[in-house]
């Protein structure tokens, strides 16, 4: 009940556009701590217990209340290692608290506390990353061209702040955001590594503004034939009303409407990559490319080279997206028809959306996290040798389970078997190193127990989904499964 009350208090502050006082509340940092611990895991998260201890939070709030609290960020304090540590700690803690404040109205837990709970929960499955692939399986077979887009980054930090103006209307909060970005500008690289959630929020806010305007044009222009360009530009998202952009819309408004009236256009994005697919011709796709480059430059002051948008024909191109390599291939099919005394043999080609796992990319992530070398040979993890045997095995099994869970949609499972082999042998080498013995003797002593730990979870999940009596279902499993509870991807090296 107390937690729900806290979320409702956040909602009240959000609706009244007065967020800054929430930074002084202890429960904000408790929420940041809890969300850090409950993050979707491939590896265990560390350092959260020290970062958000009650003593540190109380001291931080006391310093914030003081009139000269920002003196802790003074450059002279960096000469003292103690103050330098506090500088990093306080800036990181405040920044994560700030992100909690502006993120919380969109969190699933907060949505559960609202009155319209049942209506909103119907769309929970659409939050899953895997929901993209069934959509592609249904739609992409009927499309001809695809544009791979690398979304450009803003060239100046002030552009990021300006992108937040219509979402965060509290001037004090925006000034605090500017303080973080410009005070820590000299050490922005190290600060961004320690505060990944903070910068991820800023980047997503920037992309949100871009997509809101872009999708508004995409969805609404077919209904705006009788609307003048002047009224069209008064929409709230066009706060940047640049003279050049107005001239473009005023002179070429009908042409732009014609460009956007494409019912066969599909748009998908994750992180900094997006896909624009269409049934139209190559000429239409090149017009989209020209429009996107000018749209970024004129509306968001973002310089983008045309090379960041590459157009390819789906029949001879593979999509590298979300850890999968997707392609449309043709399966030849011969059909024999009997007509009275004559028979005919007809050759048909059936399109199939094929999805496989990028084994090289997965091995690269494992090598980056020191589970193996670049060639895929398993390595031990000396940092975990101090843990108990059961804890070490449980950690490796968790990583293996999450990787298998995410890449279960692959039509070829051999790549996953290779990854499981690397993790299993890396686990065995870590345990052998701990007990100061060889891997061979350790596996001989442990027997099949280690293998069962890595396979039990997958077997339980498969048996729940597909009864063993159904051979057809097991054949479908070998083809691929999509889960609707996966909301993020973590690079294996991020938590090391």
Swiss-Prot record:
Subcellular location: Plastid, Chloroplast
Domain of life from the UniProt record: Eukaryota
InterPro entries (UniProt xref): Domain_X, Maturase_MatK, Maturase_MatK_N
Record-level GO cellular component terms: chloroplast
GO BP annotations listed: mRNA processing; RNA splicing; tRNA processing
MF GO annotations: RNA binding
Record's function text: Usually encoded in the trnK tRNA gene intron. Probably assists in splicing its own and other chloroplast group II introns.
Protein family per UniProt: Belongs to the intron maturase 2 family. MatK subfamily.
Protein name per its UniProtKB record: Maturase K
Species per Swiss-Prot/TrEMBL record: Paeonia peregrina
């Amino acid at each position: 009940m107390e937690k729900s009350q806290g979320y409702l208090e956040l909602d009240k502050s959000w609706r009244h556009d007065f967020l800054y006082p929430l930074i002084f509340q202890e429960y904000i940092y408790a929420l940041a701590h809890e969300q850090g611990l409950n993050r979707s895991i491939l590896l265990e998260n560390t350092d959260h217990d020290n970062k958000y201890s009650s003593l540190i939070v109380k001291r931080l709030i006391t310093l914030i209340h003081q009139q000269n609290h920002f003196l802790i960020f003074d450059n002279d304090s960096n000469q003292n290692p103690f103050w330098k540590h506090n500088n990093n700690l306080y800036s990181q803690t405040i920044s994560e608290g700030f992100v909690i404040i502006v993120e919380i109205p969109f969190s699933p837990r907060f949505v559960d506390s609202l009155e319209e709970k049942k209506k909103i929960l119907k769309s929970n499955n659409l939050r899953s990353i895997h929901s993209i692939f069934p959509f592609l399986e249904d739609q992409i077979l009927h499309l001809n061209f695809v544009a791979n887009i690398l979304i450009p980054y803003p060239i100046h930090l002030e552009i990021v702040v300006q992108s937040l103006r219509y979402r965060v209307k509290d001037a004090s909060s925006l000034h605090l955001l500017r303080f973080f970005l410009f005070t820590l500008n000299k050490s922005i690289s190290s600060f961004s590594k320690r505060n990944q959630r903070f910068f991820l929020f800023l980047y997503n806010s920037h992309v949100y503004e871009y997509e809101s305007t872009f999708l508004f044009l995409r969805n609404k222009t077919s209904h705006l034939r009788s609307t003048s360009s002047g009224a069209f530009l008064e929409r709230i998202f066009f706060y940047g009303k640049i003279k050049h952009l107005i001239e473009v819309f005023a002179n070429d408004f009908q042409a732009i409407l014609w460009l956007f009236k494409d019912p066969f256009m599909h748009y998908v994005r994750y992180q900094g990559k997006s896909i624009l697919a269409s049934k139209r011709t190559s000429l239409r796709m090149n017009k989209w490319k020209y429009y996107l480059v000018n749209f970024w430059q004129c509306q968001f002051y973002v310089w983008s080279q045309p090379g960041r948008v590459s157009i390819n024909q789906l029949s001879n191109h593979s999509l590298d997206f979300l850890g999968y390599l997707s392609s449309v291939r043709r399966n030849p099919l011969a059909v024999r028809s009997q007509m009275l005394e004559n028979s005919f043999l007809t050759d048909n080609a059936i399109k199939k959306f094929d999805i496989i796992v990028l084994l090289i990319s997965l091995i690269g992530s494992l090598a980056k996290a020191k589970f193996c070398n670049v060639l895929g040979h398993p390595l031990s993890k000396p940092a975990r040798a101090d843990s108990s045997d059961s804890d070490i095995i449980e950690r490796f099994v968790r990583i293996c389970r999450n990787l298998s869970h995410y890449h279960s949609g692959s039509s070829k499972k051999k790549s996953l078997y290779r990854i499981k082999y690397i993790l299993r042998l890396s686990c065995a080498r870590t345990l052998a190193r701990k007990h100061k013995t060889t891997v061979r003797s350790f596996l001989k002593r442990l027997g099949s127990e280690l293998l069962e730990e890595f396979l039990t979870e997958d077997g339980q999940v498969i048996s729940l989904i597909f009864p063993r009596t159904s051979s057809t279902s097991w054949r479908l499993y070998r083809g691929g499964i999509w889960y609707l509870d996966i909301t993020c991807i973590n690079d294996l090296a991020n938590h090391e």
